Amino acid sequence: GAVTKHISSAHPYCPELRKIAIQVGKDLGITTHEKGTVVVIQGPRFSTVAESRWFSKMGWDVINMTQYPEVYLARELGICYANIALITDYDAGLEGRDDIEPVTEEAVLKVFAENNEKVKNMLFEVIKRIDLENSNCTCCNVDLSGLDL
């Protein structure tokens, strides 16, 4: 039968890439949050008010559709991976805040368009700062023995 491996995803993102991305964001004057907890929903769709309320009560900071399964697949293959989340909206709105509307596709696309250059510049700078020669990264130390790759 097929051989499977269980790879730890306790720390799914590469610590070295995260440090670089955080520093680049700060250096470029981009509002940068050094940590947070993301909840991944299956898209493409937006959350209901009930889901949004639950996510907030659970302490999750960001609702996202695109970090999983990519992060786990990268971990399985021993590939360094970090995520740069562009915050576009307040999901289904904020309770008690009539001035904040629930998300729309148009609003998300507008924020993406407004930040496209910032994200491109950030990615190019992150790539420039990756130092493969002096890396202490252990992402590639995944035991893939026994797998027919």
Segments (PLM) and residue ranges:
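Glycine-rich phosphate- or other oxyanion-binding loops that anchor nucleotides, phosphorylated ligands
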Residues: 1-95, 106-117, 122-130, 134-149
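Membrane-interfacial helix-loop-helix connectors in multipass membrane proteins
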Residues: 101-103
